[in-house]
């Protein structure tokens, strides 16, 4: 598929990629990129937000228990 075709059809191509398709993009007859579904740690970024909770609040986690006199 040419870069021009990709530009015109990007939203439908993203749907195809989400279904497992792999799309090769060409420019001047040469393959310059492949459009594939995201995998790995970056693909999951934000997916689990709000699922886990801390057992303590920030004050409990980050206090040293020592009072500091800053004057």
From Swiss-Prot:
Protein name listed in UniProt: Antitoxin VapB22
Family in the record: Belongs to the phD/YefM antitoxin family.
Source organism phylogeny: Bacteria, Bacillati, Actinomycetota, Actinomycetes, Mycobacteriales
Pfam families on file: PhdYeFM_antitox
Gene3D superfamilies documented for this protein: YefM-like domain (3.40.1620.10)
A GO biological process held by the record: positive regulation of translation
Function: Antitoxin component of a type II toxin-antitoxin (TA) system. Upon expression in M.smegmatis neutralizes the effect of cognate toxin VapC22.
InterPro entries according to UniProt: Antitoxin_Phd/YefM (IPR006442), phD-YefM_TA_antitoxins (IPR051416), YefM-like_sf (IPR036165)
UniProt keyword Kinase present: no
């Amino acid at each position: 598929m040419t870069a021009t075709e990709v530009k015109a059809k990007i939203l439908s191509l993203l749907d195809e990629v989400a279904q497992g398709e792999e799309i090769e993009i060409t420019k001047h007859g040469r393959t310059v990129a492949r459009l594939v579904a995201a995998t790995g740690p970056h693909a999951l970024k934000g997916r689990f937000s709000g699922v886990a909770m801390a057992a303590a609040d920030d004050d409990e986690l980050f206090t040293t228990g020592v009072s500091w006199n800053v004057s």
